[in-house]
UniProtKB/Swiss-Prot annotation:
Gene Ontology CC annotations of this record: cytosol
Swiss-Prot/TrEMBL keywords: RNA-binding, Transcription, Transcription antitermination, Transcription regulation
Classification via InterPro entries: NusB-like_sf (IPR035926), NusB_fam (IPR011605), NusB_RsmB_TIM44 (IPR006027)
Protein name listed in UniProt: Transcription antitermination protein NusB
Composition skew (Low complexity), residue ranges: 159-184
CDD domains reported in the protein's UniProt record: Terminator_NusB (cd00619)
Function summary: Involved in transcription antitermination. Required for transcription of ribosomal RNA (rRNA) genes. Binds specifically to the boxA antiterminator sequence of the ribosomal RNA (rrn) operons.
Region (Disordered): 154-192
GO biological process: DNA-templated transcription termination; transcription antitermination
Lineage, opening ranks: Bacteria, Thermotogati, Deinococcota, Deinococci, Deinococcales
Gene label: nusB
GO molecular function: RNA binding
One of the Pfam families matching this protein, by short name: NusB
TM region(s), chain numbering: none
Length: 192
């Protein structure tokens, strides 16, 4: 009789995995109208038990995820205000929840962390493509590229000053959104 070896889930130590973890926490918190920190604590416990609902994070990635959650809670109002001013022609109610939460997460990083803008935008676009609708990646990229440009101009930097990583291939103007936001909003995050 041959025994099957169970594949051990190895923790991931990347910032991209931490961002996806926080996106899922943010999505669940908004969907269930539950405090973000409470969902994070529950998700961390589920992850530690080996459940694959949330990505397994190594210690550094988990610490980064916790910093993101704390910052999102602390600055949520300012983040939403900036997004309201940046996304012209769309209200939050008209947008897919996945797109909005990806934008909130990335906006926090662009505004309040020293992370270079291109990798933050690239990670956001990847998450949007994975969990959002057909046009989510382009929409998120367009909004964040415009926001990044505005933020750099506010501090007197050249828009090209932060080009330390290649920008994502998708581009769309910041005043556009997915053609049918309701159709692209799943009941819960989905794997691509």
């Amino acid at each position: 009789m041959t025994r099957r070896r169970e594949k051990a889930v190895q923790p991931v130590g990347t910032r991209r995995a931490a961002r996806e973890f926080v996106f899922r926490v943010l999505f669940e918190a908004d969907r269930g109208d539950v405090p973000l920190q409470a969902v994070f604590t529950r998700a961390e416990g589920v992850m530690r038990e080996g459940d694959d609902t949330f990505p397994q994070l190594g210690p550094d990635a988990l610490h980064f995820a916790e910093e993101l959650v704390t910052g999102l809670e602390r600055h949520r109002e300012a983040i939403d205000d900036v997004l309201h001013r940046t996304i012209r022609g769309w209200t939050f109610d008209q947008m897919a929840q996945t797109d909005l939460n990806v934008l909130r997460l990335a906006t926090y990083e662009l505004m309040y962390t020293p992370e270079p803008h291109p990798p933050v935008i690239e990670s956001a676009v990847r998450i949007a493509r994975k969990f959002g609708g057909d046009d989510s990646g382009r929409f998120v990229n367009g909004v964040l590229a415009g926001l990044s440009r505005n933020l750099r101009e506010e501090v007197g930097e050249s828009p090209a000053a932060d080009m330390t990583a290649p920008a994502p291939a998708d581009t769309a103007p910041a005043d556009t959104a997915p053609a049918d936001p309701a159709a692209s909003e799943p009941d819960e995050p989905r794997d691509a």
